[in-house]
């Protein structure tokens, strides 16, 4: 099972190594605006799932939202510690 920390480490490694075929690398290459649109999309899907589709689907959408948030963190040079100090 992945944790917030292990996911961030995995995504950071893919970004640093420019792993061929990586969706993370592709998304980072498309830039902040694209990543932001994905965050908005997943946030909306999370809300719809919570409202109408149940816990399992909501958790799935939340995990996708967290993924895109972490991609944005990497894109903007934000670390886990930056997030933790603001919680």
From Swiss-Prot:
NCBIfam families linked: histidine_hisI, PRK00400.1-1
GO terms classed as biological process: L-histidine biosynthetic process
GO MF annotations in UniProt: ATP binding; phosphoribosyl-ATP diphosphatase activity
Primary localisation category: cytoplasm
Family: Belongs to the PRA-PH family.
Pfam family, one: PRA-PH
Biological pathway: Amino-acid biosynthesis; L-histidine biosynthesis; L-histidine from 5-phospho-alpha-D-ribose 1-diphosphate: step 2/9
Xref: PANTHER family: HISTIDINE BIOSYNTHESIS BIFUNCTIONAL PROTEIN, HISTIDINE BIOSYNTHESIS BIFUNCTIONAL PROTEIN HIS7
Organism, as annotated: Bifidobacterium animalis subsp. lactis (strain AD011)
Alphabetized UniProt keyword annotations: Amino-acid biosynthesis, ATP-binding, Cytoplasm, Histidine biosynthesis, Hydrolase, Nucleotide-binding
Gene Ontology CC annotations of this record: cytoplasm
Superkingdom of this protein's organism: Bacteria
This protein's name: Phosphoribosyl-ATP pyrophosphatase
Localization: Cytoplasm
EC code: 3.6.1.31
Catalytic reaction annotation: 1-(5-phospho-beta-D-ribosyl)-ATP + H2O = 1-(5-phospho-beta-D-ribosyl)-5'-AMP + diphosphate + H(+)
């Amino acid at each position: 099972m992945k944790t917030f920390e292990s996911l961030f480490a995995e995504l950071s490694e893919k970004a640093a190594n420019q792993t061929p075929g990586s969706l993370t690398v592709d998304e980072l290459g498309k830039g902040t605006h694209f990543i932001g649109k994905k965050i908005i999309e997943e946030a909306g899907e999370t809300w719809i799932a919570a409202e109408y589709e149940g816990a399992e689907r909501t958790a799935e959408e939340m995990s996708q939202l967290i993924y895109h948030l972490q991609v944005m963190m990497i894109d903007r040079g934000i670390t886990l510690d930056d997030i933790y100090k603001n919680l």
